[in-house]
């Protein structure tokens, strides 16, 4: 059952800021995501930028507490739903088109929202794996949206067939991501390694960013834009 604390706070601001159209737009977008995630549905499109500019707050100081609340939206998604990366249906359609019928392996899939979305589009060649070792994370109990094989990423790479590898929001507290990249290089992987993360900041290890050769793909970023201060993007990695 969804903890409604955040949702109720948004509803309160929806009432108190009823005359501010921009606030209403952001509040309704955030509420829609919470309602959808609670019943295992993905947002139809990318969230708008949830923060307000300094100019907007100076014009209407009543926005400041709402801005503070919305700055914690991603953390709420993590602690309540186990969602670090939030895919949307438009982006998933782009991803599915890019994959073009190839075999997909999603590693460190978490609750499997990306795989769930691809399978909902009829993609039957996608496999999701996660070791589910979430101790000391902000959420420690998994709530998979789809079938996920409980496998360590390195073992999955060695035992499952794939043409495309997807890794999103790998933790910055371990160097598993470097081991994965080194394995793909050592085995001369010629497919696509799709990465979702923020270079040198909130995702992945520093060692990974220092060695990864990144290419930003316009097609995979067209319907993905950060909704907060974390500038995660979609890359191909070599």
Name each model-derived stretch.
Residues 162-177:
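A short SAM/SAH-binding and catalytic strip from SAM-dependent methyltransferases
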Residues 103, 124-125, 192:
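Residues at the starts of beta-strands that form the adenosine-phosphate
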Residues 174-238:
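C-terminal substrate-binding/active-site "lid" region of AdoMet-derived donor-dependent transferases
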């Amino acid at each position: 059952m969804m903890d409604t604390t955040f949702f109720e706070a948004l509803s309160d601001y929806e009432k108190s800021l009823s005359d501010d159209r921009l606030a209403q737009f952001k509040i309704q977008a955030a509420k829609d995501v919470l309602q959808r995630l609670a019943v295992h549905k993905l947002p139809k499109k990318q969230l708008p930028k949830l923060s307000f500019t300094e100019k907007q707050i100076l014009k209407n100081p009543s926005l400041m507490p709402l801005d503070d609340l919305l700055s914690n939206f991603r953390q709420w998604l993590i602690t309540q739903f186990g969602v670090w990366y939030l895919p949307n249906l438009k982006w998933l359609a782009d991803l599915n088109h890019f994959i073009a019928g190839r075999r997909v392996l999603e590693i460190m899939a978490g609750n499997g929202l990306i795989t769930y979305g691809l399978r909902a589009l009829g993609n039957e060649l996608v496999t999701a794996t996660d070791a589910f070792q979430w101790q000391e994370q902000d959420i420690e109990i998994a709530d998979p949206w789809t079938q996920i094989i409980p496998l360590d990423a390195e073992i999955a790479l060695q035992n499952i067939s794939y043409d495309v590898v997807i890794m999103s929001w790998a933790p910055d507290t371990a160097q598993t991501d470097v081991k994965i990249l080194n394995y793909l290089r050592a085995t001369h992987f010629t497919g696509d390694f799709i990465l979702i993360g923020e270079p040198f900041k909130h995702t992945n290890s520093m060692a990974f960013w220092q060695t990864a050769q990144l290419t930003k793909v316009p097609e995979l970023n067209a319907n993905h834009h950060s909704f907060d201060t974390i500038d995660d993007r979609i890359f191909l990695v070599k």
